[in-house]
Amino acid sequence: MALNGVSLSLAGGGAALAIVGESGSGKSTLLRSAIGLIPQKSGSVKLFGQELKDIPARELTALRRRCGYVPQDPYGALPPGLSVIDAVMEPEIIAGVKRPKAERRERAKELLAEFGLTDERIFASRAVGLSGGQRQRVELARALMLGPELLLCDEPTSMQDASTRGEIIEALRRRTGLGMSMLFVTHDLRLAAFAAENIVVLKDGKICESGPSREIMQNPQHPYTQALIEALPKLPET
C-alpha cells in the first residue's frame, strides 16, 4: 500500500503514537518506511532528525541501532538456529557491545521476564518450538536488548490472549515512562488508546483522523473511525 499525503512526527522522551487501521490501510508500510526498510520514492522521512535518503548505508545502520523493531510476523523474524536466550542476546553481539557473557545473559533473562517468560526450558529451546504468542514476546525482548530510544511495533500482541495482551502493553508503557518513545501499529482502536497517548487512523494509505486517544475514542469525527469503534467487541458490564 502506497502512502499518500501522510505527515506525522513523534517526539522523543517517552512519547507514544499508535497507527490504527484495517489490513491494507498502509500501517505496516508507514512503520517500515520510518526506519528506511522500504525504498523512499518521494517525500521526506527523517529519523532522529536525519533525512534517510541522504545518508550512507553505514550511518543508516547506526541510526537503526538506536531503534527496536518488532515485525508483524514472528515466525520468520527470529533466527531459527539459535536458542531463545541467544536470539535475545544477538543484537548486542552484532552491535559489538562489550560486556561479560554472564551479564549479557542476565540482561536477556530480565527482558524476557518483563513479558512473562521465565522458564529456563524456554530459554534453552529454539524459536521453531515456540507458539506464535511466545515468539512475539521473545521478539519484544530482543528488540529491547540494545536499550532503544525508539521502539517500532507492528501488531505485537496479535497472537496473545486478552490477559497477556494487557500485560505486554503495561510492560511497554513502563518503558515509555522511562523515556523510550514508541510507534505502535494495530487494527484495534481500544488497544491503541491503551498503548499510546495519540492515535493516527489510516485508510487506503491516507490519514483520515488523528489526535489524542481519549478524544478519538469519545468523539470520533470521521465515519471510518466511527465504524472501527462500533466494530469493537462490547466490554462486559461490571
What is the meaning of each model-derived region?
Residues 43-52:
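Conserved ABC transporter NBD signature motif
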Residues 35:
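Helix-to-loop junction immediately C-terminal to a conserved catalytic motif
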Residues 210-211:
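ABC ATPase "signature
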Residues 52-68, 94, 101, 216-220:
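ABC ATPase NBD coupling module
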Residues 192-194:
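A short, surface-exposed alpha-helical micro-motif characterized by mixed small hydrophobic
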